[in-house]
Design a protein with these regions (language model features):
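Generic N-terminal amphipathic, Lys/Arg-enriched alpha-helix
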Residues: 2-14, 19-35
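C-terminal alpha-helical cap/extension of soluble enzyme domains
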Residues: 4-9, 290-391
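Alpha/beta enzyme core
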Residues: 19-27, 43-78, 82-100, 112-269, ...
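Short, conserved beta-strand segments within well-ordered enzyme catalytic domains
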Residues: 37-39, 59-63, 104-106
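Glycine-rich beta-to-alpha transition loops that act as phosphate-gripper elements at the mouths
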Residues: 40, 106-111, 271-281
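Glycine-rich oxoanion-binding loops at beta->alpha junctions
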Residues: 85, 105, 369
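Active-site environment of divalent metal-dependent phosphoester hydrolases
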Residues: 223-225, 280-282, 305
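Internal helical hairpin/lid segments
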Residues: 269, 275-298
Length: 391
């Protein structure tokens, strides 16, 4: 499970440098595997994701959505840049305690209406960091142009790609629409969920294949956000192969310039691809998509359910104790403090009390990290070529 790239290239820090992230993505495309990109919404879920990666001994990506970024800043502040920087600061500090893995930080699904208040300011912040000789806070950002016409999508992508080069970050784009709902941004389940080889050619012509800046492309092949009954989601992973092959043949025929030598990284796979909306997908569909150049696979719905099950399980198992905090009499002050101090709940009593958030919250990282790890374990049992650590 090695790629020949040595750990420790980033000076011992667990968060990837730009160079390290580029190595990770190239190694995945060349080796036929993908990194899980786990969405988190709190320090609890962030810790759980780190724990899951460490236990599986897998490098990976941790990301926040538009709602997650705002939530990290607090309900009253409600600022996505503040929340993103708070998330990243916590991640940098805690991830350093996991020296056996490398983690990249990513912002997920930034639609057009959020660009000016989220990704553009973050890219400007990171460009200033680079000017000072520092590493950027994040390693990649996603521009979600799936709701605008392709021409406008690529106009904005071109602008953001130029900014990403200055920020030493990677851009992720989405071509086509992913069905279902993601942070209030939704699309119907219909034929628009399928990208085309012609769109692949257009993307390569407009954005290049690495010579103008590094990017990942989420071409859609029937992907749907959320969890659905079997048969509702009709994935066509072979579309990814058609897109890759069409562009690769154009390069070989001299019809498409390739100054960055994208085919040298992985023959027949000029694009580094992203898999969105994978919850409920069959293992063979995931394996097929990864074999066609997927290097990043988003995981959100699955882990949200793992989190909520742990919460519900504790509450229902300790129903009377949770409601009757002090014998038969509820203590409103104590209830309030439990809600506001959260992780500082050790101040309120011993961890063996059912209503203590120590008991309550300690069940969440184990449950959630186990769910994160279960996807990673698939690689090592030979079910899916999905994840791999670079060592």
């Amino acid at each position: 499970m090695t790629s020949g790239i040595g750990l420790g290239d980033n000076g011992g820090m667990t968060i990837a440098t730009p160079e390290r992230y580029a190595q990770m993505l190239d190694a995945a495309r060349r080796g036929g595997y993908a990194y899980p990109a786990i969405n988190v919404t709190s320090t609890q879920t962030l810790n759980a994701a780190l724990q899951g990666f460490a236990e599986a001994e897998s490098d990976g990506i941790i990301q926040v959505s538009v709602g997650g970024a705002a939530y990290f800043s607090g309900q009253r502040v409600n600022d996505r840049v503040t929340g993103s920087l708070a998330f990243a600061a916590f991640a940098h500090e805690v991830a350093a305690k996991y020296p056996n893995i490398t983690i990249a930080l990513h912002t997920d699904h930034c639609a057009k209406q959020y660009l000016d208040e989220w990704v553009r300011p973050l890219l400007a912040h990171e460009a200033e960091q680079v000017k000072r000789g520092e590493e950027p806070t994040f390693q990649s950002h996603m521009w979600d142009g799936s709701t605008v016409p392709l021409e406008e999508n690529l106009d904005i992508a071109s602008e953001l790609l130029e900014k990403s080069v200055k920020a030493h970050t990677v851009l992720e784009i989405e071509i086509g629409a992913v069905g279902g709902e993601e942070d209030g941004h939704s699309a119907e389940i219909n034929d628009k969920l399928y990208s085309t080889p012609a769109q692949g050619i257009t993307v390569a012509q407009r954005l290049g294949l690495g010579e103008r800046g590094r990017y990942m492309a989420a071409f859609t092949f029937g992907n749907v956000h959320g969890a659905y009954k079997p048969g509702v989601v009709k994935l066509r992973p072979e579309l990814l192969d058609e897109i890759q092959t069409t562009v690769a043949l154009a390069i070989k025929a001299g019809e498409m310039p390739d100054p960055a030598h994208s085919l040298d990284v992985a023959p027949g796979k000029p694009f580094a691809l992203v898999f969105h909306g994978g919850s409920g997908s069959a293992p063979e569909e995931i394996a097929q998509a990864v074999s066609y150049g997927v290097v990043k696979m988003n995981i959100d719905t699955d882990t949200q359910y793992a989190f909520s099950r742990a919460v519900a399980g504790h509450m229902f198992s300790n129903y009377d104790s949770v409601l009757k905090i002090d014998g038969e009499v509820g203590n409103k002050k104590l209830c309030f403090r439990l809600r506001t101090v959260s992780g500082e709940s050790f101040m309120l009593g011993s961890g063996d009390r059912p209503y203590s958030l120590i008991t309550f919250t300690d069940t969440i990282p184990d449950t959630l990290s186990s769910r994160c790890g279960s996807a990673m374990v698939a690689t090592y049992t030979g079910i899916l070529p999905l994840l791999r650590i670079i060592d």
